[in-house]
Amino acid sequence: MNILRFEKAVYTLPILFGSALHIDRVAKIQKYSQSKYNFKLPIHSFYGAPTNSIWNGGRPPYYNDSMVSNKTKQYYKNIDAHKYLTYTNYLAGDYLDDPVSNLALKMLSKDDGVIITDERLHKYIRKTYPKLKTKASVVKITKEQPNERSAEYYNQLLDRYDYILLHPDDNTDLDLITQIKDLSRVEVLIDERCTRNCRVRDLHYDINAQSNIPIRDRDSNIMEQEGTLWSKYCPREKAVVLKNGKEKLDILVNTLDEIQDLYNMGIRRFKTSGRGS
Protein backbone atom coordinates (compact mmCIF):
# COMPACT_ATOMS: atom_id res chain seq x y z
CA MET A 1 0.00 0.00 0.00
CA ASN A 2 1.32 3.42 -0.93
CA ILE A 3 1.27 5.70 2.12
CA LEU A 4 2.43 8.80 0.23
CA ARG A 5 0.15 11.01 -1.82
CA PHE A 6 3.12 12.40 -3.75
CA GLU A 7 5.24 9.28 -3.96
CA LYS A 8 8.14 10.68 -5.98
CA ALA A 9 8.21 14.18 -4.50
CA VAL A 10 11.19 15.49 -2.53
CA TYR A 11 11.30 18.44 -0.16
CA THR A 12 13.68 21.16 0.94
CA LEU A 13 13.34 22.56 4.46
CA PRO A 14 14.43 25.92 5.95
CA ILE A 15 16.48 24.82 8.95
CA LEU A 16 20.12 25.02 7.88
CA PHE A 17 21.98 27.30 10.31
CA GLY A 18 18.78 27.56 12.32
CA SER A 19 17.98 26.26 15.75
CA ALA A 20 20.08 23.25 16.77
CA LEU A 21 16.98 21.92 18.50
CA HIS A 22 15.05 21.80 15.23
CA ILE A 23 17.93 20.17 13.38
CA ASP A 24 18.23 17.56 16.13
CA ARG A 25 14.52 16.79 16.11
CA VAL A 26 14.40 16.34 12.35
CA ALA A 27 17.48 14.09 12.52
CA LYS A 28 15.79 11.91 15.15
CA ILE A 29 12.65 11.62 13.03
CA GLN A 30 14.75 10.66 10.00
CA LYS A 31 16.59 7.96 11.97
CA TYR A 32 13.39 6.63 13.52
CA SER A 33 11.67 6.39 10.15
CA GLN A 34 14.64 4.52 8.71
CA SER A 35 15.07 2.10 11.61
CA LYS A 36 11.40 1.49 12.41
CA TYR A 37 9.89 1.42 8.93
CA ASN A 38 12.93 1.11 6.64
CA PHE A 39 11.70 4.30 5.03
CA LYS A 40 13.94 7.22 4.12
CA LEU A 41 12.05 10.47 4.47
CA PRO A 42 11.94 12.37 1.14
CA ILE A 43 13.98 15.34 2.38
CA HIS A 44 16.30 16.40 -0.42
CA SER A 45 17.96 19.36 1.27
CA PHE A 46 18.07 21.87 4.09
CA TYR A 47 18.61 25.53 3.24
CA GLY A 48 19.74 28.62 5.12
CA ALA A 49 22.77 30.85 5.66
CA PRO A 50 25.07 31.75 8.54
CA THR A 51 24.05 34.85 10.42
CA ASN A 52 27.34 36.65 9.73
CA SER A 53 27.31 36.07 5.96
CA ILE A 54 27.10 39.19 3.80
CA TRP A 55 25.78 37.09 0.93
CA ASN A 56 22.69 36.09 2.92
CA GLY A 57 19.72 37.82 1.36
CA GLY A 58 16.89 36.56 3.53
CA ARG A 59 15.90 37.17 7.09
CA PRO A 60 19.12 36.96 9.11
CA PRO A 61 19.06 34.10 11.65
CA TYR A 62 19.91 34.91 15.24
CA TYR A 63 20.63 31.50 16.74
CA ASN A 64 23.85 30.74 18.57
CA ASP A 65 24.27 27.80 16.18
CA SER A 66 24.10 29.95 13.06
CA MET A 67 27.70 31.16 13.04
CA VAL A 68 30.42 29.63 10.86
CA SER A 69 33.15 28.13 13.03
CA ASN A 70 35.54 25.20 13.29
CA LYS A 71 32.50 23.08 14.19
CA THR A 72 30.68 23.79 10.94
CA LYS A 73 32.18 20.91 8.96
CA GLN A 74 30.99 18.39 11.54
CA TYR A 75 27.64 20.19 11.64
CA TYR A 76 27.34 19.60 7.89
CA LYS A 77 28.30 15.92 8.25
CA ASN A 78 25.60 15.34 10.84
CA ILE A 79 22.87 16.42 8.41
CA ASP A 80 21.30 13.59 6.42
CA ALA A 81 20.39 15.73 3.41
CA HIS A 82 22.03 18.04 0.92
CA LYS A 83 22.88 21.53 2.16
CA TYR A 84 21.97 24.65 0.18
CA LEU A 85 23.32 28.00 1.28
CA THR A 86 20.84 30.83 0.77
CA TYR A 87 23.17 33.40 -0.77
CA THR A 88 20.38 35.48 -2.26
CA ASN A 89 21.63 38.99 -1.53
CA TYR A 90 21.55 40.83 -4.87
CA LEU A 91 24.45 42.96 -3.60
CA ALA A 92 26.66 39.91 -3.00
CA GLY A 93 28.78 40.65 -6.06
CA ASP A 94 30.16 43.70 -4.27
CA TYR A 95 31.58 41.45 -1.53
CA LEU A 96 32.94 38.37 -3.30
CA ASP A 97 35.85 38.20 -0.87
CA ASP A 98 33.58 37.86 2.19
CA PRO A 99 35.49 35.32 4.32
CA VAL A 100 32.48 33.89 6.16
CA SER A 101 30.48 33.23 3.01
CA ASN A 102 33.44 31.62 1.26
CA LEU A 103 34.36 29.46 4.25
CA ALA A 104 30.82 28.10 4.53
CA LEU A 105 31.03 27.14 0.83
CA LYS A 106 34.43 25.49 1.10
CA MET A 107 33.13 23.04 3.68
CA LEU A 108 30.22 21.84 1.55
CA SER A 109 30.33 18.49 -0.23
CA LYS A 110 29.82 17.60 -3.88
CA ASP A 111 26.20 18.06 -4.98
CA ASP A 112 25.42 20.44 -2.14
CA GLY A 113 24.56 23.83 -3.51
CA VAL A 114 23.87 27.54 -3.42
CA ILE A 115 20.67 29.54 -3.94
CA ILE A 116 21.61 32.69 -5.87
CA THR A 117 20.28 36.08 -6.95
CA ASP A 118 23.33 38.04 -8.18
CA GLU A 119 24.75 36.93 -11.55
CA ARG A 120 28.19 38.12 -10.44
CA LEU A 121 28.03 35.69 -7.55
CA HIS A 122 26.77 32.95 -9.85
CA LYS A 123 29.77 33.33 -12.15
CA TYR A 124 32.13 33.45 -9.18
CA ILE A 125 30.73 30.25 -7.66
CA ARG A 126 30.75 28.40 -10.98
CA LYS A 127 34.42 29.23 -11.34
CA THR A 128 35.58 28.89 -7.72
CA TYR A 129 33.35 26.06 -6.47
CA PRO A 130 32.49 24.05 -9.60
CA LYS A 131 31.42 20.94 -7.64
CA LEU A 132 28.42 22.78 -6.17
CA LYS A 133 24.93 22.96 -7.65
CA THR A 134 23.34 26.35 -8.31
CA LYS A 135 19.70 27.32 -7.90
CA ALA A 136 18.07 30.53 -9.15
CA SER A 137 16.16 32.10 -6.27
CA VAL A 138 12.70 33.63 -5.98
CA VAL A 139 14.51 36.86 -5.09
CA LYS A 140 16.40 36.77 -8.40
CA ILE A 141 13.26 36.16 -10.41
CA THR A 142 11.40 38.92 -8.58
CA LYS A 143 14.22 41.44 -9.07
CA GLU A 144 14.54 40.65 -12.77
CA GLN A 145 10.88 40.09 -13.66
CA PRO A 146 8.76 41.57 -10.84
CA ASN A 147 5.42 41.68 -12.63
CA GLU A 148 5.25 38.86 -15.15
CA ARG A 149 7.47 35.96 -16.20
CA SER A 150 7.49 34.11 -19.51
CA ALA A 151 8.37 30.51 -20.24
CA GLU A 152 11.26 31.83 -22.32
CA TYR A 153 12.65 33.59 -19.24
CA TYR A 154 12.43 30.44 -17.12
CA ASN A 155 14.00 28.35 -19.88
CA GLN A 156 16.91 30.78 -20.14
CA LEU A 157 17.49 30.37 -16.40
CA LEU A 158 17.48 26.59 -16.83
CA ASP A 159 20.26 26.98 -19.39
CA ARG A 160 22.47 28.60 -16.73
CA TYR A 161 21.38 27.05 -13.42
CA ASP A 162 21.05 23.47 -12.23
CA TYR A 163 17.69 24.27 -10.63
CA ILE A 164 15.30 27.19 -10.57
CA LEU A 165 12.53 28.37 -8.26
CA LEU A 166 9.17 29.18 -9.73
CA HIS A 167 7.84 32.60 -8.74
CA PRO A 168 4.99 31.89 -6.27
CA ASP A 169 2.58 33.98 -8.36
CA ASP A 170 3.10 31.43 -11.14
CA ASN A 171 2.39 28.29 -9.10
CA THR A 172 -1.15 28.03 -10.46
CA ASP A 173 -0.43 29.24 -14.01
CA LEU A 174 -0.53 25.79 -15.56
CA ASP A 175 -0.43 27.11 -19.13
CA LEU A 176 2.88 28.83 -18.38
CA ILE A 177 4.30 25.84 -16.54
CA THR A 178 3.59 23.46 -19.42
CA GLN A 179 5.95 25.55 -21.58
CA ILE A 180 8.93 25.20 -19.23
CA LYS A 181 11.27 22.70 -20.79
CA ASP A 182 12.53 20.65 -17.84
CA LEU A 183 10.16 20.50 -14.88
CA SER A 184 12.41 17.99 -13.12
CA ARG A 185 14.70 20.94 -12.32
CA VAL A 186 11.96 23.31 -11.20
CA GLU A 187 11.27 23.79 -7.49
CA VAL A 188 8.03 25.21 -6.10
CA LEU A 189 7.62 27.15 -2.87
CA ILE A 190 4.28 25.79 -1.63
CA ASP A 191 3.62 27.92 1.46
CA GLU A 192 4.56 31.46 0.43
CA ARG A 193 3.04 33.91 2.89
CA CYS A 194 3.15 36.96 0.63
CA THR A 195 0.08 38.03 -1.32
CA ARG A 196 -0.43 37.42 -5.02
CA ASN A 197 0.90 40.19 -7.28
CA CYS A 198 2.46 42.03 -4.34
CA ARG A 199 3.79 45.36 -5.60
CA VAL A 200 6.31 45.80 -2.81
CA ARG A 201 7.88 42.33 -2.83
CA ASP A 202 11.03 43.64 -4.50
CA LEU A 203 11.23 46.50 -1.97
CA HIS A 204 11.03 43.95 0.84
CA TYR A 205 13.95 42.06 -0.74
CA ASP A 206 15.88 45.33 -1.04
CA ILE A 207 15.52 45.91 2.69
CA ASN A 208 16.60 42.34 3.50
CA ALA A 209 19.68 42.78 1.30
CA GLN A 210 20.61 46.07 2.96
CA SER A 211 20.22 44.51 6.41
CA ASN A 212 22.94 41.95 5.70
CA ILE A 213 25.69 44.17 4.30
CA PRO A 214 28.16 46.12 6.48
CA ILE A 215 26.55 49.00 8.36
CA ARG A 216 28.83 51.53 6.66
CA ASP A 217 27.39 50.58 3.26
CA ARG A 218 23.70 50.55 4.15
CA ASP A 219 21.20 53.24 3.26
CA SER A 220 21.18 55.64 6.20
CA ASN A 221 17.41 55.40 6.54
CA ILE A 222 17.07 51.62 6.22
CA MET A 223 15.16 51.30 9.50
CA GLU A 224 12.66 53.93 8.42
CA GLN A 225 12.22 52.15 5.07
CA GLU A 226 11.44 48.90 6.84
CA GLY A 227 8.97 50.53 9.20
CA THR A 228 7.18 52.24 6.33
CA LEU A 229 7.04 49.02 4.33
CA TRP A 230 5.25 47.14 7.09
CA SER A 231 3.00 49.95 8.29
CA LYS A 232 1.86 51.40 4.96
CA TYR A 233 2.58 49.20 1.97
CA CYS A 234 2.69 45.50 2.82
CA PRO A 235 -0.67 43.97 1.79
CA ARG A 236 -0.14 40.68 3.62
CA GLU A 237 -2.97 41.28 6.11
CA LYS A 238 -5.48 41.81 3.30
CA ALA A 239 -8.31 39.29 3.43
CA VAL A 240 -10.64 37.99 0.75
CA VAL A 241 -14.24 36.99 1.40
CA LEU A 242 -15.05 33.38 0.48
CA LYS A 243 -18.37 32.13 -0.87
CA ASN A 244 -19.40 31.01 2.60
CA GLY A 245 -18.90 34.53 3.89
CA LYS A 246 -15.76 33.73 5.85
CA GLU A 247 -12.56 35.68 5.37
CA LYS A 248 -9.27 34.18 4.26
CA LEU A 249 -5.91 35.91 4.05
CA ASP A 250 -4.96 36.48 0.43
CA ILE A 251 -1.63 34.68 0.65
CA LEU A 252 0.00 32.23 -1.74
CA VAL A 253 -0.11 29.03 0.31
CA ASN A 254 -0.98 26.26 -2.13
CA THR A 255 -3.78 23.79 -1.53
CA LEU A 256 -3.24 20.04 -1.77
CA ASP A 257 -5.20 20.01 -5.03
CA GLU A 258 -2.94 22.72 -6.47
CA ILE A 259 0.13 20.73 -5.44
CA GLN A 260 -1.45 17.66 -7.04
CA ASP A 261 -1.82 19.57 -10.32
CA LEU A 262 1.88 20.50 -10.21
CA TYR A 263 2.85 16.93 -9.38
CA ASN A 264 0.76 15.54 -12.22
CA MET A 265 2.59 17.88 -14.61
CA GLY A 266 5.94 16.43 -13.57
CA ILE A 267 7.16 18.75 -10.80
CA ARG A 268 8.81 16.77 -8.03
CA ARG A 269 10.66 19.39 -5.99
CA PHE A 270 8.78 21.26 -3.30
CA LYS A 271 10.06 23.83 -0.82
CA THR A 272 8.66 25.10 2.46
CA SER A 273 9.30 28.61 3.76
CA GLY A 274 10.59 29.87 7.07
CA ARG A 275 14.19 30.37 8.11
CA GLY A 276 15.57 28.39 10.98
CA SER A 277 12.14 27.33 12.20
Q: Can you say where each PLM-predicted feature lies in the sequence?
A:
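Active-site pocket-lining/capping segments in soluble small-molecule metabolic enzymes
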Residues: N2-S150, R160-S277
